[in-house]
């Protein structure tokens, strides 16, 4: 009898301690998930892309959605459309009435909605694994830090997570009415962020081609289990999602905007995130680690859902071609971490090591955000603010600048030579033969402009003090 009581006590104590440890782990992981993105959003100041969106939102509220010509630069006759018009209006209203911090907190809230949606998605992939799924979200947060800016891509991430939840739920339950949500996401996405809208369709492709042509191969290899579900409803949802995208202020022009932009060869030269990741860059390291995890997980589990293979493989290829596409690879990569691994089978030493790595990587993300803010963005902002202090009538002043400072100068009211919207200055987009030559001959222009700045320093100072009509600025 006494032995039974002792045994019950030991079992109860072990169960209680295990429960206590789970609670502590849950609290710590949730704290990291909440705190790290918040710190990054608050530390990072509004960047050049957001400044031009605020400027655009202010313009739309005053003048409407259809300017006759591009209104912010010194160039004439360039056609122009507001490709993120709804985000521009939303951002401007929040900034105008609630301030900069409120805009950051709003987008932080959108990102946390994405994190919550990802948690629900991971629960579909790995049930009864709360600690593991929370740890996976911490890893995802650390990798996503470089994309946490006050930009409309926060909405895109949220919509993609919701889309995958809908598709996964449909695969398991075969309830076709769930797919109605995806065309709605497509319609809202093209209003908020039309320049990346096709990613909604791309995420559907693995579910559309899950089996069809590969049934025999699947059965022969016995490593790719196939779920039986109807593909036709997904095809119909795909067609509907593409069709509703035309419902926007600029019609078909917004639908094909990304395709037209990618045909501009100068973009890769001018925008680093459009180029393929450098071999020794952080992005290349993340891609390599993701591939190693995939190969190791597949070798250990010996099977994978075919749609996961297509989704991860396709987005990995995208991330290899363009650095900014890596964020779209991280979402399926998180799903694969939940699919392949089981933390319950990992030793306590490995768990402790993993927890330490999570903490270090998370706080390193905050440090990187702080370093980037203090060494670059603030310098550009301060330089533009200095001009604004000395120029009482910026709307009558033309500034011959380089790209990065252009958007903030335009927000302040100056007319600029160039800004960060590289594609706008190409005749493939603006339908003007008089488009800005800077974005076609950038290296030559950089050299000549810097030479002019150095040789005419005294003349510029004299002109700045007396005329205040034309200003050269170079923050490189």
State where each predicted segment sits.
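Specific aromatic-rich, kink-prone transmembrane helix
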Residues: 117, 140, 155-172, 204-212
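Membrane-interface transmembrane helices that cradle and orient dolichyl/undecaprenyl
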Residues: 161-179, 293-303
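Short acidic/glycine- and proline-prone juxtamembrane loop motifs at membrane-interface regions
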Residues: 147-155
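Luminal/periplasmic acceptor-recognition loop/helix of membrane-associated glycosyltransferases
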Residues: 416-460
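Transmembrane catalytic cores of multi-pass membrane glycosyltransferases
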Residues: 46-49, 61-66, 75-76, 194-299
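Short periplasmic/luminal acceptor-recognition loop of GT-C membrane glycosyltransferases, typified by
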Residues: 390-429, 459-460, 465
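Transmembrane-helix motifs of polytopic, lipid-linked glycan transferases
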Residues: 105-126
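Membrane-interface alpha helices of multi-pass inner-membrane proteins
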Residues: 37, 140-144, 165-166, 178-194, ...
């Amino acid at each position: 009898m006494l032995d039974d009581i002792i045994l019950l006590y030991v079992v109860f104590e072990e169960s209680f301690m295990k429960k206590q440890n789970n609670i502590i782990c849950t609290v710590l992981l949730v704290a990291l998930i909440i705190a790290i993105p918040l710190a990054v959003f608050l530390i990072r100041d509004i960047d050049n892309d957001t400044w031009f969106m605020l400027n655009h939102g202010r313009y739309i509220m005053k003048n409407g959605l259809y300017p006759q010509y591009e209104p912010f630069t010194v160039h004439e006759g360039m056609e122009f459309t507001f490709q993120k018009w709804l985000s521009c209006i939303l951002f401007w209203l929040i900034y105008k009435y609630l301030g900069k911090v409120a805009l950051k907190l709003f987008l932080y809230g959108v990102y946390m909605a994405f994190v919550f949606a990802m948690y629900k998605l991971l629960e579909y992939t790995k049930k009864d694994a709360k600690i593991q799924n929370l740890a996976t979200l911490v890893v995802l947060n650390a990798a996503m830090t470089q994309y946490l800016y006050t930009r409309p891509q926060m909405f895109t991430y949220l919509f993609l997570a919701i889309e995958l939840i809908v598709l996964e739920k449909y695969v398991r339950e075969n309830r076709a009415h769930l797919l109605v949500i995806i065309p709605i996401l497509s319609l809202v996405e093209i209003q908020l962020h039309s320049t990346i809208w096709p990613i909604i369709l791309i995420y559907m492709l693995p579910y559309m081609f899950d089996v069809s042509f590969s049934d025999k191969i699947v059965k022969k290899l016995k490593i790719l289990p196939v779920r039986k579900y109807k593909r036709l409803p997904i095809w119909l949802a795909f067609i509907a999602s593409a069709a509703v995208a035309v419902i926007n202020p600029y019609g078909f022009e917004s639908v094909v905007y990304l395709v037209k932009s990618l045909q501009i060869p100068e973009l890769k030269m001018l925008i680093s995130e459009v180029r393929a990741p450098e071999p020794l860059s952080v992005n290349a390291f993340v891609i390599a680690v993701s591939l190693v995890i995939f190969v190791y997980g597949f070798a250990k589990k010996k099977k994978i859902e075919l749609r996961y293979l297509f989704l991860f493989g396709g987005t990995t290829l995208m991330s290899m071609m363009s650095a900014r596409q890596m964020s779209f690879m991280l979402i399926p990569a998180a799903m694969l971490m939940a699919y392949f691994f089981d933390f319950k089978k990992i030793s306590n030493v490995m768990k402790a090591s993993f927890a330490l790595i999570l903490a270090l990587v998370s706080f390193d993300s905050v440090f990187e955000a702080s370093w980037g803010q203090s060494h670059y963005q603030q310098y550009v902002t301060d330089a533009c603010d200095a001009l604004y202090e000395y120029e009482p009538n910026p709307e009558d002043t033309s500034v011959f600048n380089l790209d990065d400072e252009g958007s903030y100068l335009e927000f302040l009211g100056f007319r600029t030579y160039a800004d960060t919207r590289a594609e706008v200055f190409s005749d493939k987009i603006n339908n003007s033969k008089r488009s800005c030559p800077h974005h076609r001959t950038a290296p030559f222009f950089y050299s000549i402009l810097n030479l002019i700045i150095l040789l005419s320093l005294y003349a510029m100072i004299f002109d700045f003090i007396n005329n205040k009509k034309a200003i050269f600025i170079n923050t490189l």
